[in-house]
Regions:
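Conserved beta-strand scaffold positions in the cores of enzyme catalytic domains, especially
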Residues: 6-10, 294
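Conserved aromatic-histidine-acidic binding/catalytic patches
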Residues: 7, 109, 182, 186
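A cross-kingdom feature that marks ATP-driven nucleic-acid transaction machinery
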Residues: 143-295
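A generic structural signal for well-ordered coil/turn residues at beta-strand boundaries
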Residues: 5, 123, 141, 228-229
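Interdomain hinge/linker elements that couple catalytic modules in large macromolecular machines
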Residues: 10-157
Length: 295
């Protein structure tokens, strides 16, 4: 009232462990559910009213009568002026256009025109700007734009591309899309959860700073350029250790093989030579063998 406030509260998303308790889930199902609903209690409540994740998807999201079918548009109405352009940008990013140049090409307009709407979406928490570990966040050349909110990410990957099928009540093409791509989608959310789990936490007796991804070109053992990527990379607060991680949301993996490859890639990084390298595997299932550092 009168533009005055005693306190302003910015409510963050509720974290993963609580959805397991709220919906009485095992760890694996909790991660899959969180990949869809994120940390919004209202979405959890809607999920709780259905018998299964599949039932909840069809009842709430994948139906024209679903409570959440138009959810992103409703959220944008409160905070953005050009809802159509905003949703279009989110659609392109959700379906794989992650570089500024790619988004601009899909939008058919100069990249400079997108700076303001992209920043707005980041400020609202819908997008995140992803840059490799150790790179200044202002480095536009290396930046990738990703949808930050799990529900929004699911919506723009599975709902928007299939909207015509949803509106015609055609379940089969949507079921095929979910069967083909849902596990891959969860794996991307799993990576983010793993980075969050490392950030600021004690891992094997060492506290680490902000965990990020790293990708780029290195010179390999054969003196040839090689593109490498790390799902998780974090520096210890005492700057002695560099944690490098591989995330897998698949069936049993060969832990020793993954660890060996992690160390091989890490030893190719010039900036890593000043650290003690700590390899870490983040696996959906226990590895086939004893792999050392696994979570």
């Amino acid at each position: 009232l009168y533009g005055r406030a005693d306190e302003i509260m910015k409510l963050a998303l509720i974290r993963l462990p609580y959805i397991q308790e709220a919906l009485s889930l095992d760890a694996m199902n909790a991660i899959e559910e969180y990949a869809v609903w994120g940390g919004v209690p209202r979405y959890w409540e809607l999920r709780e009213n259905q018998n299964s994740l599949n039932d909840a998807l069809w009842h709430n999201i994948l139906s024209v009568n679903g409570t959440l079918y138009e959810e992103p548009i409703k959220l944008f109405q409160d905070d953005v002026k050009d809802i159509v352009k905003t949703s279009t940008i989110m659609s392109y990013i959700g379906t794989g256009a992650n570089r500024l140049s790619e988004i601009a090409a899909r939008c058919n307009e100069p990249a400079t025109n997108l700076s303001r709407p992209l920043k707005k979406l980041i400020d609202l928490g819908f997008l995140a700007k992803d840059v490799p570990f150790g790179i200044d966040e202002k480095n536009a050349k290396k930046s990738l734009y990703k949808i930050a909110d799990p529900f929004m990410a699911f919506y723009y990957q599975f709902v928007v591309p299939n909207r015509s099928f949803i509106e015609l009540g055609r379940r089969l093409p949507i079921e095929q899309a979910l069967t083909a791509h849902f596990s891959e989608y969860v794996s991307m959310q799993w990576e983010k959860l793993c980075r969050d789990a490392v950030t600021g936490n004690l891992v094997n007796g060492v506290v680490y700073g902000k965990a990020k991804r790293w990708w780029g070109s290195v010179i390999n053992e054969d003196k040839k350029p090689e593109q490498v990527e790390f799902d998780v990379m974090a520096e210890s607060l005492d700057k002695k250790y560099l944690l490098v991680g591989e995330c897998k949301w698949t069936t049993q993996e060969n832990g020793k093989q993954l660890t060996t490859e992690l160390l091989r890639k890490a030893n190719l990084l010039p900036f890593a030579k000043k650290y003690t390298i700590v390899p870490m595997l983040f696996l959906k299932n226990a590895p086939k063998d004893e792999a050392g550092n696994t979570m």
